[in-house]
Amino acid sequence: MIGMGADYSFGYRLDPPRRRERLHVDALTEFVRSQLCNLLDIIVPCNGEAEIKVDGFKFLGPDGGVHGLYADRGHSGERSRDSGGNGSGAGAAYGNLANAALYEPRIDYIARQLRDILDLVDLESDGGPVAIDGFRLKNHEDWASSRVANPSDILLHASSSCDLNCVFCYNRDTIDSLAWRRRSPDEELGELEARLSCYNARAGRGLFPSYGSPYEFLSNPHALRILRELRRKTPAAFRICTNGTRLNESTIAQLEELSPVYLEVSLNSSSPARRAMLMGDNQPGTAIGSLALLRRYGVPYSVTVVLWPVPSLEEALDDLAMTAAYAEDNLAALVQVNLPGYTRRSFPQPPFDTGTVWGRTVDYVRGLRERGACPVVIRPSLYEENVTRDRKNVPEVIGTVVNSPAARCGLERGDVIIAVNGILVANRAQARDLLSILQDNGTGGKTLTVKRGGRLLELEIRPGDRRYPFTPGTGTHLGAVFLGTGFREGNLGRMRDILLARRPREALLLSSTLVKPTLEQMLEENPLYIPGGTKLHIGVPENNSLGGNIILGDLLLVQDFIDFIKRYLGSVNGKIDLILIPSSPFYLSGWGRDLSGRPYLDIEREVKIPVELIECDPMWD
């Protein structure tokens, strides 16, 4: 790529110096206080290996008194969140500082420090003051790190535009940290060149992410050029989400040349009229017809349907059946049915009754599975498990990808995996892990022991026995499909380690509506994970920040945790010694921050009770 991004600038806006509202405040003390607070949002001080909690400071000079860091400062995580103007990066091609606070908070730290400095001093050039309204990163390589999970993440930085207008689009009115400033294709290409120049696929090293909530990558006219350049860097599979509007034969043929490529096609309906109604697609035939072309060129894909209940729920379900059948006829790997979600920002009033729509959709999809060979999965899968299964976390197969090793060995819907190659399976997460090991390293015949209708059967599975649409580069778990990832028992082991180290009498574990039933079952079956002398309470915060019908725990914000804990403490007269929170709501950042870019450390600062994170992966499906 010409230039390889050397001239691309990652720049960020600074607001003008603030007017001091509280004249009685000691400006220099406030300056140091703010500088320390900024720093303590990105580091944890240590003495040797021991972490140190800092809540104040004192000067070495005449004023030797102790100054508190967080007293009377409101929501400490919101102290300087306005350092980037409106946060969206609008105007003059500035980046989104709210997004930087999420993905690379050292940039936000620089902005906050500069703003504090410019509140006190003017910078000069040639003897005169200089008005500073922004800054840019100097050496791109200085900002490279080992946080690039997969090459597909790089593509999302060229996804600020979309050519459709879906009624259920979650990008409308999203929070500042995930909001996109729509950019020209050439500007996106410049950023991609910079990112590719710093990308080391073997080391998993590259520039910090900043894609927020992406739109449609293939709408960028440089998309195929970008893919070709990325393919020179890595042989890894490209997973691309697309609305299908650009999937003509020429594009699909070029994607096949770049294999392995896997497409998640947001089709939503095989009916031209319904697709046009839901997505604003003036040429729905392109996306609908792309499924046959993908099959012809051997590009594996799945179909996504958001079950939006218009004009009625029954009509939406009938259309789902036709769409699933159409996907199966064209050898889709699977059909993913997303239970419709919305936030308070996008729909101030509920557009439908969630309990009715979600429950009826689950029942309908279970019936579809009995009639077709293509797996149909519900997202979030834990909802289906909670309303249809008494036993949670069972390694039950709900389908197999057509022509996959799992399908060709005779594995059937309803089978429960008991052992993989002689290794006993305790839960769903373990079954998936063992199947992944076989897929990555297996040769020749292996054995699956399954329970089917009360009988134990032994199946011989051959990892190499597969045809389209299953490919080892894009398929998972040898083609077996489950009710989601499952709960890892190791999470409870890490919780026990914390409880043993802390020895609280009363601990509060915060969970989610979806995970709590599985968590309670596992603790009931394994009570030794709670040490003697500790009483464990389980609470479920509501997502008041996003509102709507959002119940995924990983979408909770720091303020949701704070609000719930304060209410809970009021109900138990403050008798809690330790608060435990899964780390997954802060996973995306990599810096212990929620989706708004606020550090989880603010929870303890606000509620004045020790908070520990239980390290765990998100339970993505």
Where are these regions (language model features)?
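PDZ/PDZ-like domain segments forming the peptide/carboxylate-binding groove
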Residues: 382-419, 423-426
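Redox- and metal-dependent alpha/beta enzyme cores, enriched for Fe-S-associated oxidoreductases
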Residues: 495-558, 562
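Core AdoMet radical
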Residues: 153, 173-187, 199-220, 227-248, ...
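PDZ-domain C-terminal substructure recognizer with occasional recognition of PDZ-binding tails
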Residues: 364-373, 379, 383-387, 433-475
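Conserved C-terminal portion of the radical SAM core fold
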Residues: 202-209, 285-379
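Cofactor-cradling patches in redox/metallo enzymes
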Residues: 541-602
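Canonical Radical SAM [4Fe-4S] cluster-binding loop centered on the CxxxCxxC motif
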Residues: 127-131, 141-187
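Structural motif
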Residues: 242-243, 509-515, 582-585, 589, ...
